[in-house]
A protein has these predicted regions:
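Structured soluble/peripheral alpha/beta segments that form catalytic or ligand/cofactor-binding pockets
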Residues: 1-290
């Protein structure tokens, strides 16, 4: 069960232990999307800050810096132009980004209780623990001296651990959230050395469900990639035992970008989804070993 204490900095013994908070936003009406991360690397004495922002379907900012230093408190964390604060644990946060081309300030308000990644086999394979909130976001985005209001949905994720890249070839997370309050989170890991899609471990769950309700029994995720390797289209079928029909989602990317880090390819796409006919938005992240 996620409690207020989990909002504090997490610790671990491994040399590659990382403690990361990410906040993203989707404003479909104004065609504004973005995500920012701060990653504590306490056992290495380093901290990494990253941000990706899109406007009008185009990449407006992509930045990443890793430096010597420390972030000791998620209540007020700052690194290389990215600032995150916790106003009320598990309820309200803020994000500010100062980049070469954009400036961003937003507040994020939890719409539903936190959702914890609970899949023992998946957690063992990846080596991480994670919880997340689907949020309402409200703020301002400045590009080239012009300021635009930003309102929509988003997600805040807190994850920590020493990721098992000796056991994992590819890691994917995605979510879809509608203005009507429905939201779904998905995570998937493909084991190292596996022969394809069928060996991937997958987990999916609705936000806001009772903590005793299990995740979906069957998670079918299909993705079409564009020529640059970015997720372009995706389909989900989620089924529980006894259900006559699956819960279906279909989505198409509205923007995306790729980067590389430490022998891994990172793809970030923002999707417009149809959640059983209801419009929804969300971020699709993928990290794969080269």
């Amino acid at each position: 069960m996620i409690e207020r204490k989990h909002e504090g900095p997490r610790s671990g013994t491994g040399a590659r232990f990382a403690d990361t908070v990410a906040i993203d936003f989707c404003d479909g009406e104004r065609d504004l999307y973005g995500i920012a991360w701060i990653t504590r690397l306490p056992n290495a004495g380093r901290v990494r800050a990253s941000a990706v922002v899109f406007a009008g379907g185009e990449l407006a900012e992509m930045t990443e810096h890793e430096d010597d230093g420390a972030v000791d408190d998620w209540g007020a964390a700052q690194a290389s132009g990215v600032r995150m604060t916790t106003a009320v644990p598990l309820e309200r946060w803020s994000l500010a980004v100062t980049g070469s081309s954009v400036s961003l300030e937003l507040d994020a308000y939890a719409l539903l209780p936190p959702l914890q990644l609970e899949h023992p086999e998946l957690s063992h394979m990846t080596g991480i623990e994670q919880y997340e909130h689907v949020c309402r976001v409200d703020g301002t985005l400045g590009i080239a001296g012009s300021s635009t209001p930003l309102r929509g949905t988003g997600r805040r994720v807190h994850c920590w651990g020493e990721f098992g890249w000796d056991r994992v070839d590819r890691w994917r997370t995605l979510y879809a959230a509608s203005d009507g309050g429905r939201a779904i989170s998905v995570a998937a890991a493909r084991p190292a050395g596996s022969d394809g899609h069928d060996s991937e471990l997958r987990w999916a769950r609705l936000f806001g469900t009772d903590t005793g309700e299990p995740a979906f029994d069957q998670v079918r995720l299909s993705t079409v990639f564009d020529a640059g390797g970015l997720p372009a289209k995706a389909g989900l079928e989620l089924l529980n035992e006894g259900d006559e029909f699956p819960l279906r989602l279909g989505g198409e990317a509205v923007c995306g970008a790729r980067s590389e880090r430490d022998g891994h390819e990172i793809a970030i796409s923002f999707f417009r989804w149809s959640l059983e006919g209801e419009p929804a938005y969300g971020c699709y992240e993928m990290i794969a070993r080269r």
